[in-house]
Amino acid sequence: MRCVLPWLDSWAAKKPDAAAFEGEKTCLTWRQLHDTAKRIGTYLARQLPPRVPIALCMDKSPMTVAAMLGVLEAGCFYTIIDVQMPQQRVQLILDALHPALLLTDEGKAPIWADAAGKLPCVSTETAASCDIDESLLAARQREIIDTDLQYVLFTSGSTGHPKGVAIRHRSVLDFVEWAVPALRLDETVRFGNQAPLYFDNSVLDIFCTLKSGAYVYFLPQRDFLFPARMMDELEQRQINTLFWVPSALMHPANLGVVKDGRPRGIKRVFFCGEVMPNRQLNIWRRSLPDADFVNMYGPTEITDVCSWYRVDRTFEDGEPLPIGFPCENTRITLVEGEICVSGTCLSAGYYNAPEKTAAAFVQHPDARGIPERMYKTGDLGAYNERGELMFLGRKDSQIKKQGYRIELGEIECAIKACQAVTQGCCFYQAATQQIVCCYSGEDDEKALRGELRRRLPKYMLPDVYYHLPQFPQTMNGKIDRVRLRQELGL
């Protein structure tokens, strides 16, 4: 198998009238998804050669999934550009990608025309009105090989220019073939999707659904601001599987709505993207004692997830959670404490950025006589006494103060374990040699200082404390650390 499309064909034949992807306004059955993708694919194949990038400038919806698959039907690859992205970032992405065409939501093509410049800008309504040409699409599929690109996702770059992470078909196939059996996914699964489609966590929701015949409901973003409403939504939609960033799980736990078996019907809770504090995880586990909880780890450059840990024992609130063991067909190597990853999961590199690619994807030190790439994650790790991999923080968040080597991630873990804290993070001010603690929850600095003194050695205690009503978030739902530092003048 060279790409994901045979999975779509299979479920469209097996259960054509069953709902596949649903949002607030639209729902596509498997047959509708299949046919819409083929119509869009035919339109694109008539306009463009294979293996060119296409930008999808669309809201998150079932039609966006159809457009993604339509791009693959045409033998091309896609980038998702969210409609809420700042115009400057959109332009930087377009400049790096040089897409052959922009696909937009119905009625939005004129709005995107300015950003597109001379690029063709076409609505999905226009593309999906094309008659299906099976012979043309079959010819395109014969040209696909599994090392062709499936998508490019843009992540933040340290220079302010987003980096396009290029992922091949074979990496997605390899990931999904592991994830579906390992995570016990089948056609009874009903995902409540949180991740934006331009965020790599969505790869699991979308493509594991294609493989397993599951169902995805795109939860309205506003509902994450109102956890009580979210609990009702999950139950009304009969959602039984969540794959959310930890911040999205922490908020309802902090507000006390995760209790007494709610949200009812949840059988699986997966999380990835940032550290999940055990204090909030324990709230979920107490409310849903029979659910399967899985902690996953992996940067965008390794196709979503490279290690995983099924939560199989009791943890104290202040204990760190393991990131566990490598996924199948994946090798994790610690090089001077840095987590480095190799295997089929690896990205092809950064699109149109050979220097950045060469710096991050390097020769594996243990591979002798043959080239074998590994990706330097920039994250620090170590193995515990059980042989489980532990995440210790970012390489660039390791500081030295008063002669002591300190992991800021360990301090953050202690902050989040404090009962009165709902969210927390810390920074280091090199100029003043001060550790800065930012927290939300009860505004009681004295109590927080006292609790941290019981958890941390003196040399690790924060010097400065900022109480925040709430933390700024990135579009992916994580703490926006860059914006936070700017707001605090750090």
What is each PLM-predicted segment?
Residues M1-L5, Q87, L102-R142, V172, ...:
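AMP-dependent adenylate-forming
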Residues K211-A214, N240-F243, A253-G318:
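Gly/Ser/Thr-rich phosphate-binding loop
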Residues M58-P62, C76-D95, E106-K108, A214-R237, ...:
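ATP-dependent adenylate-forming carboxylate-activation enzymes
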Residues M1-V152, I167, D174, P277-N282, ...:
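AMP-binding/adenylate-forming domain of the ANL superfamily
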Residues M58-S61, D82, L185, A195-S202, ...:
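Conserved AMP-binding
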Residues L8-S10, P62-I80, A179-A182, S202-A214, ...:
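Hydrophobic alpha-helical segments in the ANL/AMP-binding
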